[in-house]
């Protein structure tokens, strides 16, 4: 879990890992030069499975991810962002899938999206098969990065590109590896993905442009000119939509998804976040945390 100025959300993210039904894990929290004293919110959490690393430098997400991959001691490596929430069964279900299908390298899960104030907003479904995940590489991969769990050896073989592409490290890695890897997805909602309430349009466009350049280089090298053209068309359509939303729609007034499935998932989310808040408001010490031996 790379951390940079995580603010108020870091504690809940860490507690959601402590709350996992699968207990044999290690959590590496790598602070990337935070200036907001993010780690202070974890001061009372005494858990031998948690390692906090802070070298005082700001080197970027891709560098920190590669460093944690090298430090990891388990057979499997899981991603987690500093402001998201993992559901209690996330690790258990991902490990079960990976162990039942040894051909899989990385698996992701479906998620709900949540606001800065922890309100459930919408659904982020994950395709189940490798073929559906990778059906349209020119369109990108619907495979939420912070929900990944995969073989540690896979992450070490492919690694994140350095310097990291602007806010699209995950898409670059998937594009570079999908032809010789196998991905899988779990349709169950096992994650809460936090979205910013105010979009940073210049950053969004720069991210899309960066990935377009990566795509075109990849497709041209692979002699897939049509895919390159399709990537350009997708880029144009997405940027047009981004600008339209910025100019016409007041995104802060958007209402949450109210589909039947969302109503059910929102009820589950309310129960989960309330249980995490209950733990968060309790002073944590060795008596509240079950210290399990670290992975070997």
Where are the regions a protein language model picked out?
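Glycine-rich, basic loop-to-helix element that forms the pyrophosphate-binding segment
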Residues: 54-72, 93
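A conserved acidic beta->alpha catalytic loop
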Residues: 23, 31-40, 57-59, 81
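Membrane-interface aromatic/basic loop that binds lipid-linked glycans or pyrophosphate carriers
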Residues: 215-296
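Short, acidic, metal-binding catalytic loop of nucleotide-sugar glycosyltransferases
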Residues: 15-24
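Conserved nucleotide-sugar donor-binding catalytic segment
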Residues: 70, 87, 109, 123, ...
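Acidic helix N-cap motif at the loop->helix transition within catalytic regions
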Residues: 9-11, 34-44, 85, 89
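Conserved donor NDP-sugar-binding/catalytic core segment of glycosyltransferases
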Residues: 89-121
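Short aromatic/hydrophobic "clamp" motif used to bind/position activated sugar donors
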Residues: 77
